[in-house]
Amino acid sequence: LVGIINFGAYIPKYRLGADTIGWHSNQERSVANFDEDTVTMAVAAGYECIKGFDRGQIDGLIFASTTPPYSEKQCAAIVAEALDLNENLFTSDVTDVLKCGTTALRSAFDAISAGSCGLMLVIISDSRQGPPRSETERNSGDGAVGFLLGSHNVIAEYEGFYSVTKNLLDNWRSNGDPFVRTWEDRFAIEEGLENVLNDAISAYLLKYNMKPSDFARVA
Protein backbone atom coordinates (compact mmCIF):
# COMPACT_ATOMS: atom_id res chain seq x y z
CA LEU A 1 0.00 0.00 0.00
CA VAL A 2 1.82 3.09 -1.29
CA GLY A 3 0.45 6.60 -1.16
CA ILE A 4 0.42 10.07 0.36
CA ILE A 5 0.97 10.20 4.12
CA ASN A 6 0.78 13.97 4.59
CA PHE A 7 0.93 17.24 2.67
CA GLY A 8 1.69 20.90 3.30
CA ALA A 9 1.60 24.10 1.29
CA TYR A 10 2.99 27.62 1.24
CA ILE A 11 1.40 30.57 -0.58
CA PRO A 12 3.01 34.03 -0.36
CA LYS A 13 0.83 36.66 1.32
CA TYR A 14 1.23 39.36 -1.34
CA ARG A 15 -1.36 39.64 -4.13
CA LEU A 16 -2.05 41.23 -7.48
CA GLY A 17 -5.81 41.77 -7.71
CA ALA A 18 -8.72 44.04 -8.53
CA ASP A 19 -7.30 46.84 -6.36
CA THR A 20 -3.88 46.76 -8.07
CA ILE A 21 -3.22 49.66 -10.45
CA GLY A 22 -2.87 48.40 -14.02
CA TRP A 23 -3.93 44.83 -13.21
CA HIS A 24 -7.11 44.91 -15.36
CA SER A 25 -8.56 41.69 -13.97
CA ASN A 26 -10.82 40.56 -11.14
CA GLN A 27 -8.64 37.47 -10.70
CA GLU A 28 -6.20 37.44 -7.81
CA ARG A 29 -2.63 36.20 -8.11
CA SER A 30 -0.19 35.33 -5.30
CA VAL A 31 3.21 37.00 -5.62
CA ALA A 32 6.48 36.01 -3.96
CA ASN A 33 8.19 38.71 -1.89
CA PHE A 34 11.51 40.22 -2.99
CA ASP A 35 13.42 37.82 -0.73
CA GLU A 36 11.52 34.68 -1.80
CA ASP A 37 12.11 32.21 -4.62
CA THR A 38 11.11 28.65 -5.41
CA VAL A 39 13.67 27.24 -2.97
CA THR A 40 12.53 29.33 0.02
CA MET A 41 8.89 28.52 -0.78
CA ALA A 42 9.80 24.83 -1.05
CA VAL A 43 11.41 24.94 2.39
CA ALA A 44 8.27 26.52 3.87
CA ALA A 45 5.97 23.95 2.25
CA GLY A 46 8.26 21.09 3.23
CA TYR A 47 8.34 22.24 6.84
CA GLU A 48 4.54 22.24 6.98
CA CYS A 49 4.44 18.81 5.38
CA ILE A 50 6.83 17.00 7.73
CA LYS A 51 5.80 18.77 10.93
CA GLY A 52 5.29 16.11 13.61
CA PHE A 53 7.14 13.39 11.68
CA ASP A 54 10.56 11.90 12.39
CA ARG A 55 12.87 13.66 9.90
CA GLY A 56 15.48 10.98 10.38
CA GLN A 57 13.19 8.46 8.69
CA ILE A 58 12.97 10.45 5.43
CA ASP A 59 15.43 8.95 2.95
CA GLY A 60 14.56 10.79 -0.28
CA LEU A 61 13.70 14.32 -1.42
CA ILE A 62 12.72 15.44 -4.93
CA PHE A 63 12.40 19.14 -5.81
CA ALA A 64 10.27 19.96 -8.86
CA SER A 65 10.05 23.38 -10.51
CA THR A 66 10.06 25.09 -13.90
CA THR A 67 11.62 28.16 -12.26
CA PRO A 68 14.55 27.08 -10.06
CA PRO A 69 16.80 29.96 -8.97
CA TYR A 70 19.91 28.23 -10.33
CA SER A 71 20.65 27.03 -13.86
CA GLU A 72 23.35 24.68 -12.54
CA LYS A 73 23.11 23.74 -8.87
CA GLN A 74 20.94 21.20 -7.09
CA CYS A 75 18.09 22.88 -5.24
CA ALA A 76 16.97 19.68 -3.49
CA ALA A 77 20.23 19.67 -1.53
CA ILE A 78 19.57 23.21 -0.28
CA VAL A 79 16.02 22.32 0.76
CA ALA A 80 17.19 19.13 2.50
CA GLU A 81 19.79 21.02 4.52
CA ALA A 82 17.33 23.76 5.47
CA LEU A 83 14.87 21.11 6.69
CA ASP A 84 17.64 19.37 8.67
CA LEU A 85 17.24 16.04 6.87
CA ASN A 86 19.81 13.24 6.87
CA GLU A 87 22.91 13.78 4.77
CA ASN A 88 22.68 10.28 3.29
CA LEU A 89 19.26 10.74 1.71
CA PHE A 90 18.62 10.57 -2.05
CA THR A 91 18.05 14.00 -3.66
CA SER A 92 17.00 15.01 -7.15
CA ASP A 93 15.76 18.04 -9.11
CA VAL A 94 13.08 17.71 -11.82
CA THR A 95 12.72 20.82 -13.99
CA ASP A 96 11.95 22.42 -17.37
CA VAL A 97 8.39 21.19 -17.96
CA LEU A 98 4.97 21.80 -16.37
CA LYS A 99 4.52 18.10 -15.65
CA CYS A 100 7.66 18.07 -13.49
CA GLY A 101 5.42 17.73 -10.43
CA THR A 102 3.66 14.57 -11.58
CA THR A 103 6.98 13.22 -12.88
CA ALA A 104 8.52 13.73 -9.44
CA LEU A 105 5.56 12.04 -7.74
CA ARG A 106 5.71 9.03 -10.04
CA SER A 107 9.47 8.69 -9.54
CA ALA A 108 8.98 8.75 -5.78
CA PHE A 109 6.13 6.23 -5.87
CA ASP A 110 8.22 3.92 -8.07
CA ALA A 111 11.19 4.17 -5.68
CA ILE A 112 9.00 3.32 -2.69
CA SER A 113 7.28 0.45 -4.52
CA ALA A 114 10.68 -0.95 -5.52
CA GLY A 115 11.91 -0.79 -1.92
CA SER A 116 14.83 1.55 -2.58
CA CYS A 117 13.27 4.27 -0.39
CA GLY A 118 10.87 4.15 2.53
CA LEU A 119 9.71 7.72 3.13
CA MET A 120 10.08 10.31 0.38
CA LEU A 121 9.38 14.03 0.37
CA VAL A 122 8.31 15.57 -2.94
CA ILE A 123 8.10 19.37 -3.12
CA ILE A 124 6.71 21.23 -6.12
CA SER A 125 7.41 24.97 -6.22
CA ASP A 126 6.94 27.56 -8.96
CA SER A 127 7.06 31.27 -9.71
CA ARG A 128 6.24 31.55 -13.43
CA GLN A 129 6.26 34.96 -15.08
CA GLY A 130 4.05 35.78 -18.05
CA PRO A 131 4.14 38.89 -20.25
CA PRO A 132 2.27 41.87 -18.71
CA ARG A 133 -1.55 41.56 -19.03
CA SER A 134 -1.28 38.05 -20.46
CA GLU A 135 -3.32 35.00 -19.46
CA THR A 136 -0.15 33.42 -18.14
CA GLU A 137 0.48 36.37 -15.82
CA ARG A 138 -3.09 36.26 -14.49
CA ASN A 139 -3.25 32.50 -14.01
CA SER A 140 0.24 31.66 -12.69
CA GLY A 141 0.31 32.34 -8.97
CA ASP A 142 3.45 31.73 -6.92
CA GLY A 143 3.49 28.96 -4.33
CA ALA A 144 4.70 25.53 -3.26
CA VAL A 145 3.27 22.23 -2.05
CA GLY A 146 4.93 19.26 -0.38
CA PHE A 147 3.89 15.60 -0.19
CA LEU A 148 5.25 13.00 2.22
CA LEU A 149 4.99 9.61 0.54
CA GLY A 150 5.34 6.15 2.00
CA SER A 151 3.72 2.77 2.54
CA HIS A 152 2.21 3.12 6.02
CA ASN A 153 -0.70 5.20 7.37
CA VAL A 154 -1.47 6.68 3.95
CA ILE A 155 -4.36 9.13 3.54
CA ALA A 156 -4.53 8.70 -0.25
CA GLU A 157 -3.50 5.45 -1.93
CA TYR A 158 -1.54 5.41 -5.19
CA GLU A 159 -3.27 2.82 -7.38
CA GLY A 160 -1.79 3.31 -10.83
CA PHE A 161 -0.28 5.54 -13.47
CA TYR A 162 -0.47 5.91 -17.22
CA SER A 163 1.09 8.57 -19.41
CA VAL A 164 1.08 9.59 -23.06
CA THR A 165 3.97 11.64 -24.46
CA LYS A 166 3.47 13.89 -27.48
CA ASN A 167 5.48 16.92 -28.57
CA LEU A 168 3.26 20.02 -28.46
CA LEU A 169 4.18 23.67 -28.89
CA ASP A 170 1.88 25.25 -26.29
CA ASN A 171 3.99 26.83 -23.52
CA TRP A 172 7.73 27.39 -23.61
CA ARG A 173 10.51 29.59 -22.29
CA SER A 174 13.85 29.67 -24.08
CA ASN A 175 17.16 30.03 -22.27
CA GLY A 176 17.45 33.63 -21.06
CA ASP A 177 13.78 34.51 -21.63
CA PRO A 178 12.21 36.26 -18.61
CA PHE A 179 8.64 35.38 -19.61
CA VAL A 180 6.75 32.23 -20.56
CA ARG A 181 5.53 32.32 -24.14
CA THR A 182 2.39 30.62 -25.42
CA TRP A 183 0.99 29.51 -28.75
CA GLU A 184 -2.65 29.76 -29.94
CA ASP A 185 -4.91 28.36 -27.17
CA ARG A 186 -7.33 26.66 -29.55
CA PHE A 187 -4.51 24.75 -31.23
CA ALA A 188 -3.08 23.64 -27.89
CA ILE A 189 -6.47 22.47 -26.61
CA GLU A 190 -8.05 20.96 -29.73
CA GLU A 191 -4.95 19.39 -31.29
CA GLY A 192 -3.09 18.72 -28.08
CA LEU A 193 -4.77 18.40 -24.70
CA GLU A 194 -8.08 16.93 -25.88
CA ASN A 195 -6.38 14.18 -27.89
CA VAL A 196 -3.78 13.41 -25.24
CA LEU A 197 -6.37 13.31 -22.43
CA ASN A 198 -8.66 10.99 -24.38
CA ASP A 199 -5.78 8.63 -25.19
CA ALA A 200 -4.42 8.63 -21.64
CA ILE A 201 -7.78 8.14 -19.91
CA SER A 202 -8.91 5.38 -22.28
CA ALA A 203 -5.63 3.51 -21.90
CA TYR A 204 -5.65 3.93 -18.10
CA LEU A 205 -9.16 2.46 -17.81
CA LEU A 206 -8.17 -0.46 -20.03
CA LYS A 207 -4.90 -1.12 -18.19
CA TYR A 208 -6.52 -1.23 -14.74
CA ASN A 209 -9.86 -2.75 -15.85
CA MET A 210 -11.90 0.23 -14.67
CA LYS A 211 -14.77 2.31 -16.03
CA PRO A 212 -15.71 6.02 -15.67
CA SER A 213 -18.44 5.23 -13.14
CA ASP A 214 -15.76 3.95 -10.74
CA PHE A 215 -14.64 7.54 -10.14
CA ALA A 216 -16.49 10.05 -7.97
CA ARG A 217 -14.38 12.97 -9.17
CA VAL A 218 -11.81 13.76 -11.83
CA ALA A 219 -9.31 16.64 -11.47
Language-model features: where?
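Cysteine-centered functional microenvironments
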Residues: 89-99, 103, 133-137, 182-189, ...
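Phosphate/pyrophosphate-binding loops at sites that engage ATP/ADP/AMP, CoA/4′-phosphopantetheine
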Residues: 45-59, 198-214
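Condensing-enzyme catalytic core mediating Claisen C-C bond formation in acyl metabolism
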Residues: 1-38, 134-202, 207
